Amino acid sequence: MKKITPKAMCAWIPKREDETHKGDYGRVLIVAGNKQFGGAAIMAAEACVKSGAGLTTVASDSVNRPALQTRIPECMFIDYENITSLSEQISQFDTILIGPGLGLDAYAEEIFRLVLQKSTEHQQVIIDGDGITIYAKGENPHPAAKLTFTPHAGEWERLKVLAPDAVTPTDVALAIDATIVLKGHRTKVYSGESAWQNMYGTPAMATGGMGDTLAGTICGLMAQTEKPITGTLAAVFLHSYIGEILAKKRYVVLPTEIAEELPTYLKIFSETDEHA
């Protein structure tokens, strides 16, 4: 199993070229946050924007719009109850995150199916939180888009039921044709025959919303990097690396504090020579 290291980060995060514009840094759709869990959508969106995604749009319950756009005015918004509008816009995005705070009711399942059905082979879809639970029911067709799952331990137990003959996480990743970010104290990433282990993290990060921030960082960086797996690995590293640094002076590290530091550390790693 390969280690995710600071040296690798220096190669994964490119400097920004002068002759570029917001369209060059990815168009991201985040489908998240029902009436009860709007904070999940906000934390994911904040991490996505601050990881450098060029254009970020959130599809959520309309009650979340004022809070979202007050905190993150850079985000655009789609009322996900207008399912026709959402359906028409799905194809416009490079990367889609679905699941944080989405809920498990019939409407959440309808939206989830819509996103999978409308996604194309040219898109990346990250499935997090409630999205994993819905997908694990086994009632959804495998979409044309490339999938990444971000399960914690409980969600992992549900997800691996889809691959009953699998022995290892690599077996599961191959069986469901997806990348798996298996979250834990030392998060592991499985993609095809390859596997990586993160070397950073701290119990100070054990607080609600941390997974939403990681998912937002993944979709933000995946939208910018040449290879999706590179963006995924970079996000896993940065999320824990920043958390560990902040924990040196904090008993608990909040997800929003990690998001706030993303631009600073992205700049540091983008300007550090990997051979130094």
UniProtKB/Swiss-Prot annotation:
Protein origin, superkingdom: Bacteria
Catalytic reaction(s) noted: (6S)-NADHX + ADP = AMP + phosphate + NADH + H(+); (6S)-NADPHX + ADP = AMP + phosphate + NADPH + H(+)
Family matches, as CDD domains: YXKO-related
Chain positions recorded as (6S)-NADPHX binding sites: 40, 103, 152, 212
GO biological process, one term: nicotinamide nucleotide metabolic process
Domain YjeF C-terminal: 5-269
Binding site for AMP: 211
Keywords, ordered alphabetically: ATP-binding, Lyase, NAD, NADP, Nucleotide-binding
Pfam families attached to this UniProt entry: Carb_kinase
Record bears the keyword NADP: yes
Keyword presence, GTP-binding: no
Assembly behavior: Homotetramer.
PANTHER family assigned: ATP-DEPENDENT (S)-NAD(P)H-HYDRATE DEHYDRATASE, ATP-DEPENDENT (S)-NAD(P)H-HYDRATE DEHYDRATASE FAMILY MEMBER
NCBIfam families: yjeF_cterm (TIGR00196)
Name under which the protein is recorded: ADP-dependent (S)-NAD(P)H-hydrate dehydratase
Provenance organism: Listeria monocytogenes serovar 1/2a (strain ATCC BAA-679 / EGD-e)
